[in-house]
């Protein structure tokens, strides 16, 4: 009897163990959603549908006669925009495979926007054109990899052709023309950007903010702007605007924290003896030292202010060196054996005026040697070229901008929040396009640079017929920007494309705003080479990947499980 009972217990343990394993496996499977797999023509066809629907929404914004797109937002009023990348980002499809296609086009638009800052609509319609032709060719039995090689060869040839025809720009008028085109023909925006670049230089910082009036305004901050304000409000000298204003001040630049009274006594004596205001820039000013500065300001009448040095680590130290060069002073650092108690007048910097608010400090007209400042700028430019980190490059460019040109603020005005938002989108595009044009030069606008580059592809030799078809795919795609701009202006796009290809003037194009054929360069209708080049390269790259796709894996939609009724009844039972 005892043996029988122990056998039952053993079986029960095995049963429980088996049940636990089954439960474990079933819970593991519940953690992973079921997948749906699409193959071949069906997969590419569904992807293409997503690409086409997104491209149709984006392409209506292209050109001077392009239309607005209204986007519903999860909060606030709907957004009205003519910015291609904004439209693309807002689109999401319920169908998972369609969404894969749309997401890849968004990737193209974002990549183009990140590199060139404009050209997202052009990149989107090029992607659609290349992928559409690629799908047809693969369905007809072409080798997808040979098509891709042909597409790559054609793109390389077009980029070389565009670079050979690019013209560098330098005058304010040319800069204004680029800005005007990218702002959908609004001349005022183009001129505003040209004025800003004239004021702060091509490497200067230009920022965009909301204006407080109906009109667009340009505010220029000459000199260096530090993102740190006064440590204590006791340093304020102008109660009306709550700022500390120092004229012809001495500037102490120190790498470490200042904590003892003795550390600030010597520099205060120098300021008092010279009857000049004093600014202290350091990692921090603590307790006793801070109290000493405030007491001297309140009782002895010395105009003094202290701010924390902006940045962290090596970036902070480098920024302080820049400030020392700009103001003609020295960075007081323990590494060189310097001591605050032995500071003399030659170690202090100077400038014409400093304005310090609770948030920032603006140093105007530093007393540094112009040659030393230029040498420091060259060092930073060299460091930018050698740097491989995007973060480091960004910080170096900020330092260069502060040293070389100052800061311009474009204040965008309008009658409503929606109008200001729409104008800011266009100003951002125009500013990015202008910077790209200054960097790599310009080509005739309105899509004609790509259109005429398609002629050169007739001479391109390929290894086989399928590669030749790849070249023809790019040839046909290069016609779509002109076709789309003309169509949005209410003209038959194919007629405009045909007429332009019949003649030999590489600068002749269709001015959609006026409805006539003009010399695009003379008319000021120009595109930055960097924008056109980036749009084509990114579009061809992603389109080629989609064309060579043979399977797509997506999640199946989850089944909605019936929720049991509350109270006495059971879910799903009728009485």
From Swiss-Prot:
Matching PROSITE patterns: CHAPERONINS_CPN60
Localization terms from the record: Mitochondrion
Keywords assigned by UniProt, alphabetized: ATP-binding, Chaperone, Mitochondrion, Nucleotide-binding, Stress response, Transit peptide
Chief place of localization: mitochondrion
UniProt induction comment: By heat shock.
GO BP, sorted A to Z: protein refolding
Keyword Phosphoprotein set for record: no
Matching InterPro entries: Chaperonin_Cpn60_CS, Cpn60/GroEL, Cpn60/GroEL/TCP-1, GroEL-like_apical_dom_sf, GROEL-like_equatorial_sf, TCP-1-like_intermed_sf
Presence of keyword Zinc: no
Transit peptide: 1-32
Coiled coil: none
SUPFAM superfamilies: GroEL apical domain-like (SSF52029), GroEL equatorial domain-like (SSF48592), GroEL-intermediate domain like (SSF54849)
Molecular function, one GO term: ATP-dependent protein folding chaperone
Gene Ontology CC entries for this record: mitochondrion
Similarity remark: Belongs to the chaperonin (HSP60) family.
NCBIfam families in UniProt: GroEL, PRK00013.1, PRK12849.1, PRK12850.1, PRK12851.1
Protein function: Implicated in mitochondrial protein import and macromolecular assembly. May facilitate the correct folding of imported proteins. May also prevent misfolding and promote the refolding and proper assembly of unfolded polypeptides generated under stress conditions in the mitochondrial matrix.
HAMAP family documented for this protein: CH60
Protein name: Chaperonin CPN60-2, mitochondrial
Protein encoded by which gene: CPN60-2
